[in-house]
Amino acid sequence: MYSVEDLLISHGYKLSRKLPAPHEDDGERRQPARTTVPAGPGLLNGCDDGPAALPRGKASPGTGLLSDPESRRLGPRGHGERPSTAAAARISEAGFYHQPVLAWSSQPLTGRSHAYWRRREQEAREDPGGRGPVPSLPTHPREGPWEVGGRSEHVMKKAVWEDELGMAGPARWQDVSVRSWNQPPRLGRQMSDGVGEKLFQDLYPFMLGEHGLTSQSKGKSQSLPRVLSPESLSCMEVPIPLSDGHLPGVPKVPLQPPNCASNLESTRNPKKAGTSAPLPQPRFGRPLKPPSYGSQPHSKAGAENGSYTDSRQLDPGAAHSARTNSARQDLYGPDPGLEPPVYVPPPSYKSPPQPAAHPCPEEAVSRHEGRGRRVPQHPMERPAAGGQPLSGSRGAGSEWGASPCSPVGVPPQPHHTTAYDGSILIIPFDDPRIRHIKLPRPHGFWEDVKLDGAVPAPDPRSLQQEGAVWGPSGKERGPAPADPSPSWLWGQPPRNGENGSSPDQRDPCIVTQRKQPDVSGSPQEYPESLVSSPSPQGESSCEMQTQLRKFEAGLQPKRSSKKKTSETIFCLVSIPVKSESQLPGTDTNNNDLKQSASLQEQSVLSLSSTDLELQALTGSMATRTELPRPDPGGPGRGRQADDLRFPSPAKHRALAWPGPWPGHHFRDQQTQTSFAHEPQSLQPLPGERPGGSPDPVLPPRCLDPAPFEVQMHMALASSDPNQRPGAHSPKSQGSLSPSSNSAFSGSSWPRNQGPVPRASLGQQGSDGPGRRASPVSRGEVIKGETTGPCNSRQLFGQFLLKPVSRRPWDLISQLESFNKELQEEEGSSGSSSDGSGSEDSDTELPWGSCARPAPQLPGLLKDIVPEDPRTRPGRVKSKSESWSEEGRPRSPRPWQAEGRGSVWLSPPGSWIAEDGDREVEDRVAQLAVSPRPVKRAISSGLNDAKPEPPPDPAEQREPLPSQELPGSRGAVELSAAGPPRAGGGEQGSTRAPLSLAGKSRGLSAPDLRSVGLTLVQEHSTSQLAGSPGDANAIEIPPNESLEARAARILGIEVAVESLLPGAQRAGQRRHPEPDGSALRPESPRQEAAASLAQPNESTAPADAFYGRRKCGWTKSPLFVGERDSTRQVPRASEPADVDGAVPTKAPETPPSPLESQPFLPKDVETKPPFRSTLFHFIERTPNLAFSEKKLRNTSRVIESLQEKLVSPPRKADPDRLTRMKEVSSVSRMRLLTSRAADSAEEPKAERGPGAWLGGLVAPSAGHKLSDPQGALSLEADGHPAARRENGGRDFWCPDSYDPSRVERV
């Protein structure tokens, strides 16, 4: 694990200078234990005092610092010895560390406020040994980290309180120190040391970021912990106490202190606020926490755990928040380095640790405290309280509402907080996540929500709600009504208070709240309407609420670290509610989202506390996109996403809100397990899907990536909205565009449900261009895809939530890690931006949205203009165009075929080039993903003619690649993926479109990603290498890319075997049609399989297969047959393609690669257009004409998905492998046999090869349009017919041979 110091440093924290006085004070005794950690750095946040104070404060330093975990664990034991002796002496030694923290925390903060505490702190400092009264003893057991950091912070707090309360320092200090101070800090710390320690141990991995600091500070990483201990320990210790203490039943009292602190702080808000800023930092001479956290904008502190770390380090109690803030400002004024500029600790360290119950309670406390106190100190206090909510708020709660005994009205709050703590526990985890959501467009939104008038009420109400909302795990509901903007019943109150105060962003407790405000619509879940008012769409508020719910639902479970992890996932789920950012931009979705908001509100009101809790966890997503709730089932695993698109959003909504499935409230929200139900409900979504369905489509797969993607999307919100609102805005792309489309669709369900992104992209394209171009295409696309992604985005978090509770955790973990990686990958590559349904979009949108949203291909943009990002590389259209253009240019086959990728370009050549480039890049991207894709890309490149036209579009679009960040990256990756395709490089470009048509269809996530990256690569390659061959050569390093790119594209480590099967199959099927048939389907399938299967291995193969059919599901025969058929048709009937792929890997017959290439270019050239046209047409048709197939197939897919979820991950893999081999040979024979027989029948059914042939050939320079068309038509049509005969029907059987599944296998 990373040491605290490492973590802090890596996160931008400068280890603060040593705590001068307290550390020196304690340093004498603690220096040895704290040797590794400089006294100053250790005390940096006054937390090192925690680690150092333990040694110093404990007779046995080992027990103190090293025993910090023990102290926390043994709390009573370790502290027991220390409380009277070590605590008294150490506190004295540490000055105020040990005792002050305790006294501070213990004190009810009523009578003995500052004077007493100041006195106590003075005594503690002056009387190293005399000051450890027995009262300190109870506290000391948990004082380990807390005492160290807490004492310092408490000293600071005492100073603050002394100043604030003007109490007789000595009297209050001594009395409280002995009795109240010690106990409350102990409560806060007790939580930390006793149950907190246990929890800490459980959550240690999660708390690694800052909680890890505590743990290390406890003596695991003494050096780092000490260095970080002051900063991170205190901050961390506080959260750990809250997290550990609050999490466990025992620390509930500490929660109470935080709550009490909240109350007290609320009561003393003026004092606290006033004193916080002017905290007497020099008094204790310990720069507990640099004021930077407090000083730093709440957004930073609130969002970053660094802030929390500082907060924790800074102050174990609320006093810490106020006192530390001012003290930090004063004491740590010079220590701003300690806090990172915008420290958003990685969710992995921060999320779970922060999920300590405290963050929320502390947040609430800090929030509540900060309402009065924090508002004045808003920038700093909020960061301190938000940044150090665990330590500050929790510390504040622990110290202010210091002790469970603290009579200040802590009892109610402690209870609430305690209950809430479990809920809150997740918040720290969310904090980084929240930061993610917060970052995109939350500031305005949550500020809006916050400024909603939430500020005034939250103070008192927040205090109460802290007790009420925070207290009850599901209390958020109760408080929510009280809140002016009770979007988050329990998250909202703080949110209101902090919204106004802008603490939301930094409130760990409000992580959810913060998220909520972040999204302004974030409260969407509960306050969809509430938040909706601040933010038109109620944005992703529900995400935030989801986190709150998560906290609540998982907060009790959070007591168990394991549950907390689940909750963490929930957190992830919550964050993606990005609708907020794009919600405003997309009116079409706004309606749906608003409906969701109202539904959310109703649901919140009607649901019971537990239900509300669940709703917050799952319902917020559902509320945000009622469709999304069912959608999780639909896209579940990325397959139902497609279905979700088609089902009517109303149906979705009905399913989602009422939780039509018996236990599916969460299931729906975490849609991953309720696939069959959802798809059914989702299937009706053709028209309604605009608002609700898209969201559902995405979430299933976007479990973990949601936060990242959401963040990405939020960042891309501006561009994404261009794409989304422009492209999807009319439809439900708005919903998609807000957050789902970008993060969920692009990263989550595109990779999760490859076909869905296709559909989504297609729908996006259709929504934007398709819609515009042809109502049918647009309706089709829109019906499922655009809306699907839209809702999916919103639903992303929801699904994460559900998977946590409903789905197998391993699947969730897989999905999480996969999605995370994928999102990170896609986010990096901009893949996540347009996750709406096209990998192009996904990959391109982040880059395209951000880098080149508008500068996309003008021609492409013409119709796709609204979906700028989607148009981003023109191959955004390759998927989206495929779908939308398919329907739109249905009349003009050339348009259709070319328009699929480049139909938007007016010139057929340009279209083809555009399409070819797009598809080639898509293909190349997938090629890079796997040898099979590479071969497919090469095969695609085989068409010289095709690359020729594409160069124009490529160059036309080259600006797009250039503009699109993925352009260079794509070019590079294409280069990486291109080498194998070097021989057929040009053909790769050409072929790729063909493959892309099916592949981007077939593989939403990989394709999107590949396309996003490879498209630009291909474009760049195509353009950079004037000759398509050259471009392909550039983009051909699929071998290198295979794993690397697969990992990048999929965002998850893909087994080489998974990719290699693609290579093998590419080899196997290359001879027939390696690129279009084997490569494209295989690569997408493999990519989708890898992307889908890896996230949910049980559904992995099917997921890849079905995800590929996400769009294809709509056109189940098409997708299955065409994709599979095309794959195998080219295999069996396209040796030329193989030849084209020969350069890469044409295992079958490289008769004459050059000869084949010229022929194949025609063939492929012809084939890609025809295929694009027919295939996409079919794909669209499944949406419309083939809706029955789509529905039936979708049902099958959903069933299969459900089976897979239920059944072992790779149950069918052996079958599939065997069947794959069988079907491969059979399908080759059948392809050869049925190529001619089924050619007429298949073109329509398959519409892939034939469409590509006709559409692409004609636009392509008509390379043997008739001949290739006939050949490909037979090949594609006859083969697809045979294929569908052979595999199409089979494919629908999850265990049936599924090229995509086979690929995956």
From Swiss-Prot:
Any Gene Ontology CC annotation: ruffle membrane
Species of the source: Bos taurus
Transmembrane feature ranges: none
Coiled coil start-end: none
Ranges where the record places region Disordered: 13-86, 120-151, 249-419, 450-545, 575-604, 616-795, 818-1005, 1062-1166, 1234-1305
UniProt superkingdom: Eukaryota
Pfam family, one: JCAD
Subcellular location: Cell junction, Adherens junction
GO BP annotations, alphabetical order: cell adhesion; positive regulation of blood vessel endothelial cell proliferation involved in sprouting angiogenesis
Basic and acidic residues: bias regions: 21-31, 69-82, 120-129, 140-151, 360-369, 878-889, 945-958, 1276-1288
Lineage: Eukaryota, Metazoa, Chordata, Craniata, Vertebrata
PANTHER family tied to this protein: JUNCTIONAL CADHERIN 5-ASSOCIATED PROTEIN, JUNCTIONAL PROTEIN ASSOCIATED WITH CORONARY ARTERY DISEASE
Hydrolase among keywords: no
Name of this protein: Junctional cadherin 5-associated protein
Biased composition range(s): Polar residues: 530-545, 579-594, 669-683
Modified residues (Phosphoserine): S841, S1004, S1010, S1152, S1239
Compositionally skewed regions (Low complexity) per UniProt: 595-604, 729-748
Composition skew (Pro residues), residue ranges: 337-358
